[in-house]
């Protein structure tokens, strides 16, 4: 498996902390839409794309952890819309500036933290 398909976990209220497995290269549109119990997500190196509204309305997430990635994944529109005000998007410190300036990541720049 190299992708998480569209809508696969949409409205899954039992997910809390998840680690996306190594080898996953893409996350489909609305894959985790409205997962209201989700509190953290860790992404593997090699992730290349995140689909439209993939994590929209996941309103209890404390952080998204991209620190294992060596490159910035392509982000589709509204992927993280509805982020809690205190939610962090954790990225490698060496890529923080580039991440904040990357296409479709700029709207989340206030949440991006280099670690």
Walk through the language-model features, giving the residues of each:
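Structural signature of tandem-repeat unit edges
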Residues: 1-6, 12-26, 36-49, 58-74, ...
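Short, aromatic/basic amphipathic alpha-helical patches
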Residues: 78-79, 97-109
């Amino acid at each position: 498996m190299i992708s998480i398909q569209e809508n696969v976990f949409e409205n899954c209220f039992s997910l809390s902390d998840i680690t996306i497995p190594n080898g996953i290269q893409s996350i489909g549109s609305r894959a985790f839409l409205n997962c209201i119990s989700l509190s953290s997500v860790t992404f593997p190196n090699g992730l290349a794309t995140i689909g439209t509204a993939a994590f929209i309305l996941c309103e209890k997430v404390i952080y998204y952890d991209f620190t294992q990635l060596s490159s910035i994944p392509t982000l589709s529109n509204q992927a993280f819309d509805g982020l809690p005000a205190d939610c962090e998007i954790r990225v490698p410190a060496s890529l923080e500036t580039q991440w904040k300036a990357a296409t479709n990541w700029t709207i989340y720049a206030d949440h991006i933290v280099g670690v």
